[in-house]
């Protein structure tokens, strides 16, 4: 083997790696060094975070930008998430699906995520005897979770467990999740649409984008525009070559509608001549059969007025679709009173059943 001086001379004219290769040529061949694991490094200033997976870096970058690219498209929801996995887990709250079943003997509990199933199994079936005991004198209280013990011990020390580190704040919280939620009040969510708006919550940012940066959705058939995708989806039914429609059951009418609401409105206003909802705007006086129609009309006089969301009314005696459309209202029965039969032996509900056959669902060619 060459003396160390040879190595020094080689270093002066070559790179360090080449020098050591040259110095070791006369010795036994060395095995190749294992490749270092690839790291994905955050490019934001003053941030040294790095990850072994690209998706982990993508999720981390969202913390800098405030972006949540995975949005729930269920009507009326609009929640957004950093990872597609979080969105998939959230969608299960809409569907009610719980695909993960506990395999422990005698336990049939179901969960919407694998992690929740794992936590349940560890807590209920594996660590039944494991207890976290308070070490303070004359206490000895026990807890199933370590975090519960830590929160309890704050009562002894009178020190906040999770404290906000923002200068001038000093608020403290009982759990890390509540502290994390509070931290967003300091950081905020920056609007990415070219304005300087900063929201305190993600929901507030979504509301700002919807109201300030409205993006009209265009119908490719008739060029009509809509504010929401579900409005466009409903509108596209009018262009479909075949569609389900509701036909007016009144004799000699034959009018058809694409929604039950419009059919009900037609029967009340045209056949029953019932339009009890009057516009109170000065000089207007228009009347409507349905309260929702009046609410929509009111926007004509006050464009800045938001359309009211329909509230779910308290449950009341159910009526069939036929009774709504025909105008027939079955008589109320006292509690515990049995059904009285018609002269032909049929119950009063048979009138509704017969009416139902007149509400036709047609297919337009």
From Swiss-Prot:
SUPFAM superfamilies: beta-beta-alpha zinc fingers. A zinc finger (C2H2-type) spans 40-64, 70-94, 100-125, 132-154, 162-186, 189-213, 217-239, 246-271, 277-301. PANTHER family: TRANSCRIPTION FACTOR IIIA (PTHR46179:SF1), ZINC FINGER PROTEIN (PTHR46179). One of its GO terms (molecular function) is DNA binding. Ubiquitous. This is Transcription factor IIIA. One of its GO terms (biological process) is rRNA transcription. GO terms for cellular component: nucleoplasm; nucleus. Involved in ribosomal large subunit biogenesis. Binds the approximately 50 base pairs internal control region (ICR) of 5S ribosomal RNA genes. It is required for their RNA polymerase III-dependent transcription and may also maintain the transcription of other genes. Also binds the transcribed 5S RNA's. It is found in: Nucleus. InterPro entries: TFIIIA_Zfn-C2H2, Zinc_finger_trans_reg, Znf_C2H2_sf, Znf_C2H2_type. The keyword RNA-binding applies. Keywords: DNA-binding, Metal-binding, Nucleus, Repeat, Ribosome biogenesis, RNA-binding, Transcription, Transcription regulation, Zinc, Zinc-finger. Its main location: nucleus.
